[in-house]
Regions:
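Alpha-helical transmembrane segments with an aromatic anchor "belt"
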Residues: 80-104
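Alpha-helical transmembrane segments of multipass membrane proteins
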Residues: 26-34, 64-68, 107-115, 180, ...
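Functional transmembrane-helix hotspots
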Residues: 112-143
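Short, charged juxtamembrane terminal tails flanking transmembrane helices
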Residues: 10-13, 190-197
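Low-complexity, acidic polar-rich segments
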Residues: 141-159
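Individual transmembrane alpha-helix segments
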Residues: 156-179
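Transmembrane alpha-helical insertion/packing segments
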Residues: 2-80
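C-terminal halves and exits of single transmembrane alpha-helices
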Residues: 96-119
Length: 197
């Protein structure tokens, strides 16, 4: 029985790791695809680069992370239900939560770390484009008086040299993502616990 339990945990770990790595690769392909499109197409302005980045983050990555989490947890839940002989052997809330959370956490940390390392090494000009895109977006959505204040801030070196991809922002962004990962994992764990197929 001990060997069986060990094999089940290893199979679960392998599924989580495979899903996480695939998810991280998809995120990085989206990120570098947009970066390459921006760097090779002169018609894309910094404001558009920022806008496309936000669209990808909000409308593609959120459902992608949730979908990977759900289907990984569902896959493990079905596998456990198929071989379970008692009710106690079915997937528990705790195990389902771990599976969903680890799938998103591993992929999120890998992709976020690669993106932050990239922006701090060879992508500094893209960071400038994002910063200008943020300011252009703010200026486009404000009245003329506030837009002038933002335009003046572009001339201040301490504002324009703020590193958007420092450790401070990395951990701030990661903490926001962790709260999303926990909420999504809890919902899916509640839905998939002790499920029989």
């Amino acid at each position: 029985m001990l060997g069986y339990s060990y094999l089940c945990r290893m199979n679960t770990f392998n599924k989580v790791l495979r899903s996480s790595l695939l998810l991280a690769v998809i995120v990085l392909v989206l990120f570098f695809g947009l970066y390459i499109a921006y760097s090779t197409n002169a018609q894309i302005q910094p404001k558009d680069y920022y806008k496309y980045t936000m669209i990808i983050c909000c409308f593609i990555l959120v459902p992608l992370f949730a979908g990977f989490s759900f289907f990984t947890t569902l896959s493990v839940s079905r596998a456990k239900a198929k071989i379970a002989t008692t009710y106690e052997e079915l997937l528990t809330f705790k195990d389902a939560f771990k599976i969903g959370f680890y799938t998103m956490f591993i992929a999120g940390v890998i992709s976020l770390a690669v993106i932050f390392i990239f922006f701090n090494t060879s992508g500094e000009w893209a960071q400038d484009a994002l910063r200008n895109g943020i300011l252009d977006t703010f200026m486009g959505n404000m009245d003329a008086e506030q837009a002038k204040v933002i335009e003046q801030s572009r001339k201040e070196p301490e504002i324009m040299k703020v590193n958007l991809f420092s450790f401070k922002y990395f951990f701030g962004l990661l903490s926001m993502f962790l709260s999303f990962y926990m909420a999504v994992s809890a919902i899916f764990a509640q839905f998939l616990k002790k499920r029989v197929y």
